[in-house]
Amino acid sequence: MQVLLLSMPDSFEHMAPVAVRMPNGALTSLAGNVDAHHRVAVADLILVQGRVVETVTDLATRLSPDIVGLSVMTFQRRSAHRLIILLRRLLPEATIVVGGYDPSLAPDAYDDERCGADVIVRGEGETTFRELLRALERGESLANIPGLSWRNGSQFVHNPDRPVSQLRRGELRLPRRDARVLDDYTLLGRPVDVIETSRGPARG
């Protein structure tokens, strides 16, 4: 399947957009943890804040993705809704998936049929997203995938939460930074990238 993963164009709320142009590490981690035959492209829209519509239109046209995933923080919700409306017009057959802090904490914000999602990945996404792609590819039910919410007609079904992954077991693979289709990440004008060294609270 062809997968397009997008992070929102909004910068951190109290910093100038030009100061923070950092990549979304979660999306490259998703890309690194799907089955190898899927073709995944990651686009951090913070790099194209003045050309969001043009960039998304170009990517949708060139890639014709089957799945489009959006990573959303709460202050980015309006941008996500606008992007979903655009994507519905550009890719009426694509499955639109949202994940990240905001959909995990407020899934009801994404249940509108016009600007809402088809599927919500709640909590840690790597395993849930991989299982989602497998189910969609095989035409299987989504009902047995922990950590998933999915549209059933006009209503959403919320599956049970997925347990937090235990990284010491090696159950997650490394991120795929080569899936990025945009570049030139900077922090205060200097080149930057991100690396995840831990998850969750330091104790407990």
Language-model segments: which ranges?
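Glycine- and acidic-residue-enriched helix-capping/strand-helix junction motifs
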Residues: 13-27
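Short, acidic Gly/Pro/Ser/Thr-rich loop/turn segments
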Residues: 11-13, 157, 166, 202-204
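Radical SAM [4Fe-4S] cluster-binding motif and immediate context
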Residues: 22, 176-204
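Glycine/tryptophan-enriched, flexible segments
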Residues: 171-174
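Extreme N-terminal starter segment of soluble prokaryotic enzymes
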Residues: 1-4
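Short, charged N-terminal beta->alpha structural module
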Residues: 26-34
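Short hydrophobic segments within beta-strands
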Residues: 6-9, 13, 43, 71, ...
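Glycine-rich beta-alpha loop elements in corrinoid/cobalamin-binding modules
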Residues: 20, 33-167
